[in-house]
Amino acid sequence: SSSSAASDVYMRQINACNFPSAVPFWKMIPAIMCGNTCVWKSPQDAPLLSFALARIMHQAGLPNGVINLVHGKGSGAGQYLIDAVDEGLVNKISFTGSTEVGKMIGEVCGRNLVSCSLELGGKNPLVVMPSANLDNAVAGAYWGAFGTAGQRCTSLGNLIVHEGIYDEFMEKFMAKVK
């Protein structure tokens, strides 16, 4: 499924530090299973885990050159991977990170008709209606707001509580927070 005869790499994966193994493997494993190679830019804040995981993959028998790990800052190593799109050397970019960088990657991919997967900072709402089980809603809101210190794209961004249950919900929620 190559759009460029010169393309040696199917996918470039640039991921954030908050889920340094799960997110890239969600994308790379299917690409590898389909016979493609990947360049993986490790998060600059957590490069050692990426290195250890790539090493384990090689030790398990994955041939050299299937996963190619790159370390460095986004403005250096990451930019190099994005520049490869303009050069016709890559067929897919997967990026997890900021909306600002995601917009730039989307623009580069769009003008080159290269597929991209962008997981950017979300503002996920939780809507609590009068028919809700308030104990479950409180538990969900608590985990969504504070689980993993809010460092994930699925963190609770907006809590919307129906006015008819607002006081009861907030009393239970604040008791859990304290």
What are these regions (language model features)?
Residues 1-10:
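Single conserved hydrophobic/aromatic residue that forms the stacking wall/gate
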Residues 5-6, 31, 50, 109, ...:
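Small-residue (primarily alanine) positions within well-ordered alpha-helices
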Residues 11-14, 31, 35, 67, ...:
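Buried hydrophobic positions in well-ordered alpha/beta secondary-structure cores of metabolic enzymes
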Residues 13, 24-78:
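PLP-dependent aminotransferase-like
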Residues 16-18, 98:
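Conserved AMP-binding
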Residues 28-29, 78, 82, 102, ...:
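Generic hydrophobic/aromatic pocket-lining and core-packing "Φ" positions
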Residues 61, 98-178:
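ALDH superfamily catalytic-core signature
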Residues 68-94, 98:
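A structured beta-alpha segment of the ubiquitous adenosine-cofactor-binding alpha/beta core
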